[in-house]
Amino acid sequence: MSKIIGIDLGTTNSCVAVMEGGQAKVIENAEGARTTPSVVAFTENGDRLIGQPARRQGVTNPDFTFYAIKRLIGRTFDDPTAQKDKAMSPFSIVKAPNGDAWVKGRDKDYSPQEISAFILTKMKETAEAYLGSKVTQAVITVPAYFNDAQRQATKDAGRIAGLEVLRIINEPTAAALAYGLDKGGNKTIAVYDLGGGTFDVSLLEIGDGVFEVLSTNGDTFLGGEDFDLRVVDFLASEFKKEQGIDLKGDKLALQRLKEEAEKAKKELSSATQYEVNLPFITADATGPKHLNIKLTRAKFESLVEDLVKRTIDPCQKALKDAGKTPAQIDEVVLVGGMTRMPAVQEAVKKFFNREPHKGVNPDEVVAIGAAIQGGVLQGDVKDVVLLDVTPLSLGIETLGGIFTRLIERNTTIPTKKSQVFSTAEDNQPAVTIKVAQGEREMASDNKQLGQFNLEGIAPAPRGLPQIEVTFDIDANGIVSVSAKDKATGKEQQITIQADGGLSEADIKNMMADAESNASTDKARRELVEAKNHAEALIHQTEKQLIEHGAKVTDAIKGDIEKAIADLKEAAAGDNAADIAAKHQALMNAAMKLGEAIYAAQGADAGEGEDAPQSGNDDVVDADFEEVDERK
């Protein structure tokens, strides 16, 4: 049975872990790192890069290097947050045919689900390389405050990557699992999760293997990216004052500023000052310009003070919803890279009136929790019960555009709730059920999840028909809704899909495209390997001909030289099968040279039977060890 892996699909970095020997283990990627940058790039020559290689070339390829894509997943193009992202991204965010926010690639437009799928594929391959077996199932984490559309989009990304997503789990809940699995006694904990693009806070009661989420709150557009942008704005502003040049119109300069802003932010967690030094940042008629600005920790903290304060309001709401006071919280667990910032730690300490717990790795704890949940689903982890909640209220639009809640926020999931409604007009033959999610009083102010029609209602005065609407939320927090006419028994049911979102056909096309790309990538790698093997064999054989060519007839020598020329010609092309065939032909021809060398050595030694054991034999073996590369 294949292992169920746990993946933290982060805004800035992603991480994969698996249960092994009763412990969750974070798996290192091919570059030897325990986290992988959530960056995807398309190069000019058609290569697709993922992770650190993509990040490294971002400065020279800003138009087609995609980062922080998680902030767009499940969002429409017209969403204010997507528009905000569009204004500050060096790559192009475009409107898809379904109204969603997509990104413009070199050859086509990509959905955030596809870009996320490339990152998930990298995580999947990382796990497969470590485990030595195929991986098909995963638990993937999302911010607790993700709505239904964002959760569904994340699940779709998993499918495109070839993964069956067994469970979508909230990031703070996953962190609590990792923190509390081996803790004894009953505790009420707060998980403060400030990551690269999102902020969540969850309150949980843990004890005896039961993890019960009491409340959750957050902001899906607040994270490290916003802190970076404040530094970028500051640096660009200072440079404009000094040089009169606006760097924000220069994509290359903007990308360099962003990279340096991120470095400054990290350094200022331990240092009190950071020197931003970017030579040749731009040029004008007078020549090249250099940027050199000193940024102190105090200045950085003043730039982001309001962002840190924005995390406190959700903390207050989460406490209120759970009916708790800060004094009733036994432990505050910090999650996410931004919690390394001293000002963030101080704000948490001040609000909860206690030192936050720093005993978990904020970059890895979420993936570890996801792996533990995978272990629970696989049966490897016993006696653990996880009771999560829905982060936002769910309901429908009723007469006058009012939002009528059926399921209140922070309701334990999975859950099911029904309520009876009626018609607004006499002899109304159908009703449209408009489903929304949020906390505003008017339906139009909340997130519209979708709509469907219940038709064939028997003619009757308004208010008489009884339409039973049922909401069902599964353990992933994904919603399905049904409406039933109690008089006729007619029923209509849908799993909510946002007005945008990917259709089943879209997902299948993207899955096929991903598989096709995987085949193309494999073929490209095989071609490169074939060329490398060919060059090695050509070099070795030419060397042997120079040293031992006199030991064979001119005919044999001519055959070998022709085989070398044929392989050189094949290696200059792009046909891996042709290269392999010519490679084999040269090996066959070169064997005659090898036989002649052995025969000559035997004659020199005067001991025919012992000649193969001569000291020089090692050299000959090494020269023709290329035989193994046919395997």
UniProtKB/Swiss-Prot annotation:
The lineage of its organism: Bacteria, Pseudomonadati, Pseudomonadota, Alphaproteobacteria, Hyphomonadales. SUPFAM superfamilies: Actin-like ATPase domain (SSF53067), Heat shock protein 70kD (HSP70), C-terminal subdomain (SSF100934), Heat shock protein 70kD (HSP70), peptide-binding domain (SSF100920). PANTHER family: HEAT SHOCK PROTEIN 70KDA. Induction: By stress conditions e.g. heat shock. InterPro entries: ATPase_NBD (IPR043129), Chaperone_DnaK (IPR012725), Heat_shock_70_CS (IPR018181), HSP70_C_sf (IPR029048), HSP70_peptide-bd_sf (IPR029047), Hsp_70_fam (IPR013126). Keywords: ATP-binding, Chaperone, Nucleotide-binding, Phosphoprotein, Stress response. Residues 603-631 are annotated as: Disordered. This is Chaperone protein DnaK. Belongs to the heat shock protein 70 family. One of its GO terms (molecular function) is ATP-dependent protein folding chaperone. Residues 618-631 have a biased composition (Acidic residues). The modification Phosphothreonine is found at T198. It comes from Hyphomonas neptunium (strain ATCC 15444).
